[in-house]
């Protein structure tokens, strides 16, 4: 809470939690005072008995109303958010657990670019929802935001439709040694986590820069920043198993059985680390010829897409 007025303020933070039928299930408040120009964090606890838990096949959402009121009980500011109650745990060799139980279903997913024909990335909210609906109807359960945070409308759709989301820091194949570059990435990560941390669809965070050769201390710093901005349980970060500083991450992305060989085909598994196949069957040849069976050749028409589909069918 930040007091940007020219005088001191005394009041309270008040919250109300409603179920999907509009019934109030919990409420509370906490008084506070702020001098002019000052800011503070106010924490208000909440205990919900027998909650409806969020999960992909039953994505139950509550409505949270938060108000700032003055000493005369006038509403000065506030917001409303849909939230879900759930726990996610990555337990190394014991796999992924949701709401205290091993998750029994295949974690099939895709990378999603925020893009549509003609309009580019200027998608309407309805197009974001349409994308999420089609992906969920196709049987997908995990979406990786490639390679930047997606529009809030897409995150809202994933909350509503039951899709896990891997949230990515904006950045791709570029590093600058100037200190200001890392500082701006750190700011991006803080803003990203603050914006999306209350979405039940957030499965894990990818706070590194995609396919980028960054310094090892950068890897440690981004994990520390993530936990500063989300200092609660069920907060996980992932990176490539071959990346610098991967020892700071509880989740490693590997590419087993995809024909690439090399370090991504991990031979020695750490039972404390969770390994996730981020790209399945992604057979890149030399990155130049564009004749990989799993990627679309950069030429016009449907032929390259049909070749890609045939390649995946044979994988």
Per-region residue spans from a language model:
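Substrate-binding/catalytic cleft of secreted carbohydrate-active enzymes
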Residues: 129-134, 142-315
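Secreted/periplasmic carbohydrate-active enzymes, especially glycoside hydrolases
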Residues: 1-157, 162-165, 187-188, 203-204, ...
